Amino acid sequence: MESNYSDNLVNEFKTTYKLEGTDFWQLKRGGKSQWIIKHNALEKVAAQDKITWTLDVLNFSPDIVVKCIATSGDRTVESLGESSSKNTMMQFPYAMAEKRAVDRCILKLLNAHAYIYSDAEADDFKEPTSNRVKSDAHNKLNKIAENKING
């Protein structure tokens, strides 16, 4: 049931928000598959749904904690995003904490939290190389088409 619901959500997001197949991928772990969505795709969805948010940094050091309060229509949710040297290999821990908090709120407002995860959730949620190659090729084709259209 959970897998079907997750699959349906991904298909609904692709259709409703005009997202590409390269905005998602399946992470295979422990014999199960989990849908992952790109942070940038979630920001596109938020813009289309007019989701707004405010951020508050609750802790600076050594661990960073950012609180996000997000609103869509008459619904408001909140979530925390954390980042530390133990769960973030990137050199931008504040940005990662912010992305995690915002993405969790967006997914909650879309009733997709716990069914689809953001790529910002964990370093091991990163996009597979094969998907990145497809995405790069897709972007190059779009640029070629734009150049032909714009002269």
Name every feature range the model reports, one short phrase each:
Residues 1-151:
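Polyanion-binding surfaces on beta-sheet-dominated domains and ring/shell assemblies
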